[in-house]
């Protein structure tokens, strides 16, 4: 422990020197000297002394053998060369020091002789990793101890992990008498206090004292021996009964107000679940007011049981002008209300190696265009903020006033913040925001007057007996008082109010107590018209009375991507408007992702809102880099940020459409920058996100540049997949091949030149000889010069290989058929809205195979009656075709097109196979989603005017419905897309029907539950499900394509956990919300 003691003593000198009045600026410490032992491990104390497993191995102390003494460190159970013992050196070896790392190693008896060496895994704060070899690999046997020794130094990096690796993946070995010796100290240049990298505060707990740390509640804090990170001691927190219980320490005396610092600590737990999230948080006190403290999480991470992990982030210390009088860091588990806290939430945990260092100050880019001004829109562009953005000296404030002209309080104008106790309103923070906005000529959006969340319990209880609910009259009066007191105070100062927030239930209809809201249940139907949405009507009327000129908004999430939820919103607003309710706008929160919902669906939702006669506001916009709740944290890559940038551009192009129509009021980003996003730690604990226009250092991301100057960005390469199937050009009568109806269309409409209007839509198929295209162009005027160009070549051409034939892979298809060199490769068919090009492009068989990628782009030229030209492309927004093959999109050649022809027939739904089923087509669930093996099904299909019939025989030897979750039970799921729009999110015609082996049903999307039929029967090999799925708008005299998929869920172990999922078509696992991967069924005419 000598090395750690040395570092601790130096840190103690440093901390004392930074206390006020102690002449910190003149301090110079005596550093460690050459020859000093920084770290020494003999393992005689019986602990691993901070060494942990790298990979699925066992690392423990053994008394079987030792180089000196009686014990050594043993590593067993290895399966990979890199598996072994590891030790963090982050706080042991510093930049530019030269150290000698050594240790004695020997094999456990019976292991094959491998070569062993020490390696350092070195990471920077962006996650980039280097692997530094410390010593030459030495052959080691089980006969004698071998010394591994080498010198090590580094210049860049934020974390160091030393590990022992072997050329043999299975060898078990011993380590003893490990040490790190300082060979050469780093150059002495501490500079002024606050220089980047300088330690300002450290807590190692090796002296056995808690120091100034204290509990936040009734929990117990103690320094324990035998458990530590790279040491023998750490700070343990136990007897916790609340999630916020944890160790806390005051750090403000050690920090310069207004500076940027890096906070880090290591955490570990060894009781309870396999994983647990630990948060690093701050408690802020202003003007010595201990009654109104502010809390903020600065970092969060998911720990694995028994393994230490670092929690770290940069923070900005509040400036002197804020009145900051206390800044305390603490550790906790994710917050829950007391009534929801479980034993898992209150596990004991350990903290060690706490450190705060100075870092480069965070500053905004002052020489880039002002975002709101550059957009030049008539709608307000805003951001949601916390209180730090109201401090003019904080860089977040600078970012806000430079780029935005509207502000929203993220949390401090919600109900619990404004009136925590009945009759006692808290005005301080809201007043600051309103005054700040006035001083900077900004609009204010008030968020929110009424919500089911973050509302104090007293609203809903009897004032004389809190055990009883409030009466209708009491709750109505409280609502009126709350709304009118706040709106009256800020009359003429707050431009817009979110009057009610999130009143639509995800399960359909208005929220009630079962879905988290008591407003509807208590107030109910006041006017006796049979409708219980009266509390919403009253809230709007109260707000209008208090400020007749404020814009009043009904705000909700998910309505841009859920047709059923938007249906509920439209019905509600129609009904309220008919009663004269003063609703001015519908607020679309727009918490979207890079993957959905698609622009087409958002446009449709906006159109439906505008059709009601109200305006549109985008109120909480952000764009997650994750596809859903099941995705774990991933590194942020340049390609990912470029993809996000182009999606942001598409969204703002859509906003411009509605701004030009005069119905877009405002667009608000839910946060200023990624360092303050609410999506960190939500919906997945410990997961960081990057959803906004500015990064964690407040620097402009590609998404910002996509809005102000897209030409500065590289061209993003869109991707699409072509299925394999043979297809013919239209016959002599112009009839197209029916197989095109099974193919999903790729729309493109990026205007390079001219006016918006012309659009394209392409379908792709491939076979062993050619790439087949169906390109539909919307262009109402047929003029000479109208044409479609296709640019296609093998993907490896982008690496500089010789171009294919034709030159540069360019094909020109004239609308009039023309006489060009490509005339024999295509046909053109006119239709009501424009024309369709059918083309078969011969390519080398070497380039046409599943998994191959083609470089592809499309360009439409539209000649217009006024002599001008409009040009639209799919991918190359710089219009540098055909020369720039690297600017083309990617077309991946996929597997067989999943489609089937379904014959007409009406079987009896009883779980038995009628004779009719003998003529039915059969499909199989052979596409893996999860699990390497498990239950699968063969299914037959029939249809009539009312139903699609499915007879599925599932092979599943162990049947289970142990889980309370329907999707984890042994079952099949039937997905249907009646209009075959193949969208990234469900439309009103899309539905999910689930039937388990015991004929218990559950549903998703927009099912017609009352018409659905099913029957099940157990078999020797599993079970049979026969089902009838309701159809709409089908005719027996014509064939019709619909979207369909079949899924089999299997709890293979019978333990209540789904172990495998197999599908007919869609491997994505998103079929419950996304119809784009469904297969296609052709309902053959009778």
Curated annotation (Swiss-Prot):
The active site is at residues 502, 556, 620. GO terms for molecular function: carbohydrate binding; endo-1,4-beta-xylanase activity. Keywords: Carbohydrate metabolism, Glycosidase, Hydrolase, Polysaccharide degradation, Repeat, Signal, Xylan degradation. Residues 365-710 form the GH10 domain. Gene3D superfamilies: 2.60.40.1190, Galactose-binding domain-like (2.60.120.260), Glycosidases (3.20.20.80). GO terms for biological process: xylan catabolic process. Its EC number is 3.2.1.8. Residues 1-31 form the signal peptide. Consists of three different domains. The central region of the enzyme is the catalytic domain. The N-terminal region contains cenC-type cellulose-binding domains and seems to act as a thermostabilizing domain: a derivative lacking this region shows a lower optimum temperature for activity (35 degrees Celsius) than the full-length enzyme, and a reduced thermal stability that results in a complete inactivation of the enzyme after 2 hours incubation at 55 degrees Celsius. The C-terminal region contains family 9 carbohydrate-binding modules. This is Endo-1,4-beta-xylanase C. It comes from Paenibacillus barcinonensis.
């Amino acid at each position: 422990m000598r090395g750690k003691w040395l570092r601790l003593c130096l840190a103690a000198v440093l901390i004392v020197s930074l206390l006020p009045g102690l002449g910190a600026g003149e301090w110079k410490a005596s550093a460690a000297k050459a020859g000093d032992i920084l770290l020494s491990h003999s393992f005689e104390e019986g602990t691993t002394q901070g060494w942990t497993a790298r990979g699925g191995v066992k690392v423990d102390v053994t008394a079987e053998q030792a180089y000196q003494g009686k014990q050594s460190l043993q590593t067993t159970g290895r399966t990979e060369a890199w598996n072994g013992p590891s030790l963090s050196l982050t706080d042991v070896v510093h930049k530019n020091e030269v150290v000698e790392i050594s240790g004695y190693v020997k094999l456990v008896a019976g292991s094959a002789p491998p070569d062993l060496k020490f390696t350092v895994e070195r990471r920077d704060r962006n996650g980039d990793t280097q692997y530094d070899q410390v010593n030459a690999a030495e052959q080691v046997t089980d006969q004698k101890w071998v010394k591994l020794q080498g010198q090590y130094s580094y210049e860049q990096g934020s974390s160091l992990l030393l590990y022992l690796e072997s050329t043999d993946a299975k060898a078990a070995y011993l380590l003893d008498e490990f040490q790190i010796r300082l060979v050469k100290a780093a150059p002495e240049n501490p500079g002024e206090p606050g220089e980047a990298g300088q330690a300002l505060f450290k807590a190692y707990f090796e002296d056995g004292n808690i120091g100034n740390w204290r509990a936040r509640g009734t929990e117990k804090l103690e320094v324990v021996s035998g458990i530590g990170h790279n040491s023998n001691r750490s700070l343990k927190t136990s007897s916790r009964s609340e999630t916020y219980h944890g160790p806390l320490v005051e750090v403000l005396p050690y920090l310069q107000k207004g500076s940027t610092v890096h906070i880090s600590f290591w955490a570990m737990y060894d009781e309870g679940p396999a994983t647990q999230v630990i948060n690093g948080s701050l408690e802020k006190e202003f003007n010595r007011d201990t009654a109104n403290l502010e809390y903020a999480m600065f970092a969060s991470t998911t720990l694995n049981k028994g393994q230490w992990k670092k929690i770290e982030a940069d923070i900005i210390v509040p400036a002197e002008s804020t009145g900051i009088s206390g800044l305390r860091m603490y550790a906790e588990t994710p917050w829950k209300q007391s009534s929801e806290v479980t034993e898992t939430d209150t596990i004991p945990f350990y903290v060690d190696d706490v450190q705060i260092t100075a870092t480069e100050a965070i500053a905004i880019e002052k020489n880039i265009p002002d975002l709101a001004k550059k957009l030049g829109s008539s709608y307000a562009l805003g951001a949601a903020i916390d209180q730090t953005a109201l401090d003019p000296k904080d860089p977040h404030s600078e970012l806000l006033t430079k780029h935005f002209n509207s502000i929203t309080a993220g949390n401090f104008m919600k109900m619990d913040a404004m009136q925590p106790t009945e009759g006692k309103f808290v005005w301080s923070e809201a007043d600051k925001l309103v005054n700040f906005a006035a001083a900077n000529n900004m609009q204010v959006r008030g968020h929110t007057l009424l919500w089911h969340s973050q509302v104090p319990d007293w609203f809903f209880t009897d004032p004389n007996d809190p055990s009883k609910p409030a009466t209708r009259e009491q709750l109505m009066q409280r609502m009126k008082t709350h709304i009118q007191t706040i709106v009256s105070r800020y009359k003429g100062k707050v431009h817009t109010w979110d009057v009610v927030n999130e009143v639509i239930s995800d399960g359909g209809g208005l929220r009630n107590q079962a879905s988290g809201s008591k407003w509807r249940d208590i107030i109910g139907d006041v006017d006796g018209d049979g409708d219980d949405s009266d509390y919403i009507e009253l809230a709007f009327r109260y707000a209008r009375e208090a400020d007749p000129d404020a814009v009043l908004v009904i705000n909700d999430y998910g309505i841009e991507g859920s047709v059923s939820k938007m249906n509920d919103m439209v019905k509600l607003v129609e009904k309220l408007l008919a009663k004269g309710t003063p609703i001015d706008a519908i607020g679309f929160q727009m918490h979207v992702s890079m993957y959905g919902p698609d622009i087409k669906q958002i446009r449709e939702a906006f159109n439906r809102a505008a059709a009601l006669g109200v305006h549109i506001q985008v109120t909480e916009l952000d764009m997650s880099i994750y596809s859903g709740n099941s995705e774990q944290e991933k590194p942020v890559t340049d390609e990912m940020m470029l993809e996000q940038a182009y999606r942001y551009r598409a969204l703002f192009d859509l906003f411009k459409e509605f701004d030009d129509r005069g119905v877009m009021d405002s667009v608000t980003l839910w946060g200023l920058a990624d360092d303050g996003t609410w999506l960190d730690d939500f919906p997945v604990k410990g997961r960081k996100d990057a959803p906004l226009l500015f990064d964690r250092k407040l620097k402009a991301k590609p998404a910002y540049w996509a809005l102000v100057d897209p030409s500065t960005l590289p061209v993003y390469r869109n991707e699409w997949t072509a299925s394999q199937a043979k297809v013919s050009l239209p016959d002599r009568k112009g009839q197209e091949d029916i197989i095109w109806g099974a193919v999903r269309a790729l729309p493109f409409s990026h205007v390079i030149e001219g006016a918006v209007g012309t659009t394209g839509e392409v379908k792709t198929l491939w076979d062993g000889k050619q790439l087949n295209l169906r390109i539909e162009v919307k262009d109402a005027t047929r003029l000479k010069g109208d044409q479609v160009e296709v640019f296609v070549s093998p993907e490896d051409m982008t690496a500089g290989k010789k171009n294919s034939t034709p030159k540069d892979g360019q094909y020109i298809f004239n609308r009039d058929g023309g006489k060009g060199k490509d005339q024999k490769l295509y046909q053109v068919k006119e239709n009501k809205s424009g024309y369709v090009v059918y083309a078969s492009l011969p390519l080398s068989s070497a380039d046409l195979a599943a998994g191959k990628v083609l470089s592809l782009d499309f360009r439409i030229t539209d000649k217009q009656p006024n002599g001008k030209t409009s040009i639209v492309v799919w991918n190359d927004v710089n219009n540098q075709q055909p020369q720039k093959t690297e600017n083309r999109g990617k077309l991946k050649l996929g597997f067989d097109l999943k489609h089937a022809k379904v014959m007409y027939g009406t079987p009896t739904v009883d779980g038995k196979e009628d004779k009719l089923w003998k003529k039915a087509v059969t499909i199989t669930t052979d596409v893996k989603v999860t699990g390497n093996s498990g239950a699968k099904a063969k299914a037959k299909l029939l249809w009539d005017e009312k139903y699609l019939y499915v007879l599925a025989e599932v092979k599943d030897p162990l049947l289970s419905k142990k889980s309370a979750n329907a999707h984890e039970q042994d079952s099949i799921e039937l997905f249907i897309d009646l209009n075959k729009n193949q969208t990234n999110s469900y439309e009103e015609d899309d539905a999910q029907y689930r039937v388990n082996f015991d004929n218990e049903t559950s549903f998703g999307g927009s099912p017609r539950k009352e018409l659905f039929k099913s029957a099940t029967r157990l078999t020797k090999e599993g079970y049979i499900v026969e089902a009838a799925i309701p159809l709409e708008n089908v005719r027996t005299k014509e064939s019709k394509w619909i979207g369909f998929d079949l899924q089999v869920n299997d709890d293979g172990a019978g333990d209540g956990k789904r172990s495998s999922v197999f599908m007919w078509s869609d491997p994505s696992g998103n079929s419950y919300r996304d119809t784009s991967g469904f297969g296609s069924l052709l309902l053959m005419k009778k």
